[in-house]
Amino acid sequence: MSKRPSYAPPPTPAPATQMPSTPGFVGYNPYSHLAYNNYRLGGNPGTNSRVTASSGITIPKPPKPPDKPLMPYMRYSRKVWDQVKASNPDLKLWEIGKIIGGMWRDLTDEEKQEYLNEYEAEKIEYNESMKAYHNSPAYLAYINAKSRAEAALEEESRQRQSRMEKGEPYMSIQPAEDPDDYDDGFSMKHTATARFQRNHRLISEILSESVVPDVRSVVTTARMQVLKRQVQSLMVHQRKLEAELLQIEERHQEKKRKFLESTDSFNNELKRLCGLKVEVDMEKIAAEIAQAEEQARKRQEEREKEAAEQAERSQSSMAPEEEQVANKAEEKKDEESIPMETEETHLEDTAESQQNGEEGTSTPEDKESGQEGVDSMEVEGTSDSNTGSESNSATVEEPPTDPVPEDEKKE
């Protein structure tokens, strides 16, 4: 009898009384009801986790896996549970848990970070332990034994189904388990065989030329359709961006062309204006300015001289008029003092004037002398006007003096 490994479950004790002649009984207990005895009535073979029906096939239990790391809140709860329980001995468990939950919510992020760090560290260790657990000989042996048991159960179910079709009895008696044969599935020989097969399988996978694809790199059909749609949308967007870039490039080239054209036109205009520039001779300009000033001075002197001459002529023309006014005043005085004498003198004057008039009309020489005086006055007026227009003076010309009648000249 081989030694049982530590991970193997303890064997089921054999029943005290066997009743092979009674169909349907597996392990008879005289103190139990017949309906609660271990019957095998053709149900699902998986309903019995430990011992199956009449074949005695057992499904082994897996070895104990590593303990999962505690969550940060559970770590904090374990740490402060005794303290809260001691301070509140009369409270119930759920009330204490409520208090601890409020304390956890009141903690700052820095205080919670300590428990989070511990949890993350233990989680990394747990993942490593799970990898070692899945690769351990005990777990591999459990997998092999479980697969064999499931295969045997399937075979038994097929046989039972065939018996039912052939009309064989529905119930069968489960045979008693032999403690000596219980360890055959977990013997050292089976463990060594499983380890040997595992090692050779790993070596063949490592040394094989085929590359094992990563599960994350496997692309499903739905994912492929989504990726195709994304590629199409990206291509459309790329074409749109390329069209926008072409438009921007065209606008830039147009602006650049206009800028260059304006620059060329400006340079040409500047060259033309530089070619048309006149050299300035300051001496010549100074001489022209002096000449213009001299001419302006001469014109000013001429205008002043002409103005003085016009004033003299106006004064000379005004003197006979003043004499006439004075004579008229004296005549009025004489008429007032001697009215009779004035009448006589008036008659004589009228007679003389008539005689003079007859003489003036009869003698052509007097007419010619009068016409010459008028012509001379007109010539003087035209000469004055010509001199005034040539000098461009702003002075107003004096009107030509009226010709003096011959009677007044004689007086």
UniProtKB/Swiss-Prot annotation:
Key word Flavoprotein present: no
Polar residues bias locations: 46-57, 352-363, 382-394
One Pfam family, short name: HMG_box
The keyword DNA-binding is assigned to this record: yes
Membrane-crossing segments per the record: none
GO CC terms of this entry: bBAF complex; brahma complex; chromatin; kinetochore; nBAF complex; npBAF complex; nuclear matrix; nucleoplasm
UniProt-recorded name of the protein: SWI/SNF-related matrix-associated actin-dependent regulator of chromatin subfamily E member 1
Species of origin: Mus musculus (Mouse)
Gene this protein is translated from: Smarce1
